[in-house]
């Protein structure tokens, strides 16, 4: 009894906040509480055996009772055995249920994980797409923002002309934004059966020469919409350029083509072509020639063989090699060449790399910097992996500026007087230059505007000073506008592309043209350019295209020689200092990447 009471008292004192383990220290009042404490202990033991609750103070009292006497320990042990059985059954059920629940949760988690990953990817993709769309919107808005106030206004200019204080009304009007914004298609000139690759006005602006894939050259009276004459060029492949030589009385046309030949046509006063003769031969396609502004006898020619010829029609052997364009020891095929109108000793070339190269004919030393006077390139393209090509470049009217159009890139304006390696000064965006050798040009008597075609079939005109798009016209149903030729004196523009006609544009609209759909076209061009930069497949396409063209040229060549009486006429009039007619078959597959049609 004392042992039991002792243990009970220990529990009771613990409940009261004090701990006493000596029975001699208990008072009479404490002995009176012993009976009630024992009842509470038995009740708590009974509750413990029924509920299986072993936590809290009950667990502490049970442990203390087990250390006092064996008799009480046996009673407790019998209760504990019952409790142990009760616990083990519940625990097994709980463990079993818990394991099944965990397995189900794991299975659900495994099924849910791919779904969550897909949702996360979709959310990230949507977020990236929305970010890209927002960035594209911001970019388009910056390219189509409000224009500054025009410098030339029609009513004040007319009033000044009436008062006799403006002697240059037409000159200034041709360079006015208000006229460019009123451009509208006047008519088409139809006479070719292939893509039209080249256009050129004579000095007076009365005639317009055009060359085509049909191997013909047509000289137009563009006002009356009638051909003055048309003739076979003598070329064996796509005619890329045909230009009137200045101060020649419109009697001499210089031509070049994919076959690499440089030919000259002599026109008679009776509106016929007397003959054409070959004066030079490139080992590859020849896209452009460069006229000297006042010379009726001399011009320059550049080809994909990296060679620049100077041609003087007064010489027995007209062509002489001027320079071979190289980057370090590697040849750089050329697509374009232009003579500085203010300093005809200097000329610029561009081609199958990212550099605009300027040469001075008096100082070409190929042992020193490969003969280059200076080079320009947008700094972000110098060491880039974009493989940018220059498809066209032109000098401004006074030679102070140089405009270059890059394949699958933008158009850049350089100051030609800047030092070697200088950065561009202006950049013109929005068009697409990928499918062909795209032309670019200045428009206006003072080169106030920049004009370019695009793969989307539109013509873009930018104000040079602000870089803003001020005119946007659908120029080709076939999808690509290649050639843009401003009239030398009037506010007129001639364009051509994959369509088989020449289009004449003039400022005859009653109001400024609404730039309807411009933002959508710019977005589409930007997306296509970005996609092509990520997924370039043009290498395979170029190899296939080169193979097919090479095969067709061979078949056509053999067919001509099998026909009776064919084969000697061209050779009789050829005067070439260079390689044979078959050099066009030496073009590599990468030379076809920028073909004009």
From Swiss-Prot:
Similarity section: Belongs to the WD repeat DCAF8 family.
Motif segment (Nuclear localization signal): 114-122
Protein name, UniProt field: DDB1- and CUL4-associated factor 8
Biased composition (Basic and acidic residues): 65-99, 124-137
Alphabetical keyword list: Cytoplasm, Methylation, Nucleus, Phosphoprotein, Repeat, Ubl conjugation pathway, WD repeat
One GO term of the biological process aspect: protein ubiquitination
Cellular compartments per GO CC: Cul4-RING E3 ubiquitin ligase complex; cytoplasm; nucleus
Pathway the protein contributes to: Protein modification; protein ubiquitination
Role description: May function as a substrate receptor for CUL4-DDB1 E3 ubiquitin-protein ligase complex.
Domain of life: Eukaryota
Stretches the record annotates as Disordered: 1-147, 558-597
Classification via InterPro entries: DCAF8 (IPR045151), WD40/YVTN_repeat-like_dom_sf (IPR015943), WD40_repeat_dom_sf (IPR036322), WD40_rpt (IPR001680)
Protein's organism: Pongo abelii (Sumatran orangutan)
Keyword Repeat: yes
WD repeats: from-to residues: 191-230, 234-275, 281-321, 329-369, 385-424, 432-472, 476-515
Compositionally biased intervals (Acidic residues): 100-112
Motif Nuclear export signal, residue numbers: 39-50
Phosphoserine: modified positions: 21-22, 99, 129-130
Subunit structure comment from the entry: Interacts with DDB1, CUL4A and CUL4B. Interacts with KPNA1, KPNB1 and XPO1.
Keyword set includes Zinc: no
Modification Omega-N-methylarginine, positions: 204
Residue stretches of biased makeup (Polar residues): 1-24
Entry's localization field: Nucleus; Cytoplasm
